[in-house]
Amino acid sequence: MEIISLNVVPQCSVVTWSSKLATKRLVPNRSSLLFSGVKKSRLVIRSGNSDGYVVGENDDLGRIARRGESTSKVLIPGLPDESNGEIAARISHSHCEWKPKLRVHYEKAGCDNLDAPAVLFLPGFGVGSFHYEKQLTDLGRDYRVWAIDFLGQGLSLPTEDPTTMTEETSSSEDKEPFWGFGDKTEPWADQLVFSLDLWRDQVQYFVEEVIGEPVYIAGNSLGGYVALYFAATHPHLVKGVTLLNATPFWGFFPNPVRSPKLARLFPWPGAFPLPERVKKITELVWQKISDPESIAEILKQVYTDHSINVDKVFSRIVEVTQHPAAAASFASIMLAPGGELSFSEALSRCKENNVQICLMYGREDPWVRPLWGKKIKKEIPNAPYYEISPAGHCPHDEVPEVVNYLMRGWIKHLESGGFEALPLLEDTEEDWEESRIGREIEFPRDGWKKAVNLWLYGSNYTYWRGVRESFRSSFIRVFGGKSA
């Protein structure tokens, strides 16, 4: 890591990493470094004057750079670039059969790192293990890394139709085009509901039977909820939880264990077969949301940086929507009951069991805004809370260099028993407990230099202070940088 600190007394910190970068263009009047060859570099803090290359000048770090006040730049490695001779971890695909006809698809990398910590990634809604390719190829060089597809999503969809047609229906000319739209449930699919409780149990099986030891578990959006839920109910299987813009709510219907009387008021709990009315609604909704144009629009919403190539993610999502079980699985997911524990209850349970939690949130997420991450920070003050800008709902795919840098640093911090400093605290004497630390993070990507802003919020940084600062930042953006 290298920190270039402006107008401050230089200190020294040494971190080594390999890099090979051919810069296509150096921007005039901007600090740039050109690396050539694959070699070990000693990176230290440097002081000097610079105009500060900041992406997103409307935020706090952008205003600091324009005013010429003190700010810092942290240089981190990019993703492994095989075209430049760097070695990326190889990804392999596998399946395991949890229950009859229910195969769990997963990807893994770095399994030759026998003594390294185990890391498990859980996907968000509508995607799968493929969404963590940039973590598998990079973090897989140092750790043993897995990413799974939740049942009912990705490549963990049913391998057979969970329903059958009656003789009367099957003989009619108008046969259902989708699996799961039959009249009778197959024995193996009896009481099958793609719910939070099912996914929690799926993760338990995977950790116990496939990985075989406690893991560092990370989840984005829905995957974050499942990761926290799993850690709350199985803390002995978890070494730490990373929440990547985790959704704090899922399941709109009452859980039958938690609220049995209330649950009976809702006749269909998301199991197969789908009721006739649900079939008709599902067909209409599915026709819209599975349309490639709709998928492209959703990706445009959740990715802040529209220069990022999401073609591979787009094609994988479209591919999954064409599976015959996709529509019925979608209906089951959307109408499934909530979990036995709410997000807040799972968080409290993790706090009671001293489960280590780290928060990494994209600041420009239009769905799970950083406000939710700051509420978690309020409940667990000692949890490191990192905010990245510009980054949206999927920071692990939009700015994987930053997320991987934070993941490595956090795991090292825990593995060392706290001896290794958290990311951004390696070379600072700032009183970060009462405030927040902001840095400009620069990294190579596709031969160019790219920069984002990163903040670490202190343990005593209050929730309401964060709300006030967010309001102030929005106010300044609206009124053109004028302070109130």
From Swiss-Prot:
The keyword Secreted does not apply. Disulfide bonds: none annotated. One of its GO terms (cellular component) is chloroplast thylakoid membrane. Gene3D superfamilies: alpha/beta hydrolase. It is found in: Plastid, Chloroplast thylakoid membrane; Plastid, Chloroplast stroma. The keyword Plastid applies. It comes from the Eukaryota. SUPFAM superfamilies: alpha/beta-Hydrolases. Residues 1-47 form a transit peptide. GO terms for molecular function: pheophytinase activity. Changing S221A: Loss of catalytic activity. Keywords: Chlorophyll catabolism, Chloroplast, Hydrolase, Membrane, Plastid, Thylakoid, Transit peptide. Disruption phenotype: Stay-green phenotype during leaf senescence. Delayed chlorophyll breakdown during developmental senescence. Pfam families: Abhydrolase_6. GO terms for biological process: chlorophyll catabolic process. Its EC number is 3.1.1.-. Optimum temperature is 25-30 degrees Celsius. PANTHER family: PHEOPHYTINASE, CHLOROPLASTIC. Interacts with HCAR, RCCR, PAO and the LHCII complex. Part of a SGR1-CCE-LHCII complex, which acts in chlorophyll breakdown. Belongs to the AB hydrolase superfamily. Alpha/beta hydrolase dephytylating specifically the Mg-free chlorophyll pigment (pheophytin), yielding pheophorbide. No activity on chlorophyll. Belongs to the chlorophyll catabolic enzymes (CCEs). This is Pheophytinase, chloroplastic.
